[in-house]
């Protein structure tokens, strides 16, 4: 949980050069992030707080090519989308490595229901999705399961929105065997503890100078801490402070240049942290001002935290072999190609004779 560790250090240090209010706010947020890291199960819920008109205005500002505009159906689905993530570890999350996590679940939903869900329990991954709804959202309807040939196998269950599962350990072993045949796997990107500390110190120094913290009492015993900063100034100075550490970062991590960031809006953005009994329960960020578009009336993100529940394996999931699934997919495609009949070939021969 590098991000949690860095965020905690940043928020604590941000008060060091500030007022008494800065000191109090930074200390409280530091403790709140520290409590999150000590949990073994944790759930996050991310809500996109927007509306169709704002999404359409944002899309229009990007000047899409004719025909590539966001469909109304997609805007409606995205406008109230929610992403829920739960994790479970054998150790406190702040001390956990990849092998310590024993369960993970992620779900994407909206007012109409669940759109897609993914769970990782032990060596198995479980997946299901509402392809009918997703197809409408993308403007490209999914094929009907009953229209698929027998060779499609488990692909039918996938399209019907049923739970399917596959063995991730077997997939990793197969991938490793392929990498060995090609000369060995590439080293995985890592961020060592020394580099993490350098990053935290660099970011903390900028936050202390550029971010304004304030505290206020809320309802039902909650407390609100707001952090406000001009967006372009903050991110430009953040990346400027981090850039000298590039040589210590994992390969492939490229940082944006000042030139890349010069057109970013410098509007002030505020994050509102909600604490209850000292625990961080919610973060709200209003991004509408960053759009610099009067038609974007509503564009916010809300992140809610809770203790979480243990992810469980769904019952009656159909086991599939990814290779068999691909064979079924290509088999279905070949079946469609087979419909290119002998009469079609005869027509081609005729066309050649006419040349």
Describe the predicted segments one by one:
Residues 18-355:
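Subset-of-secretome marker
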Residues 1-6:
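N-terminal export and membrane-targeting signals
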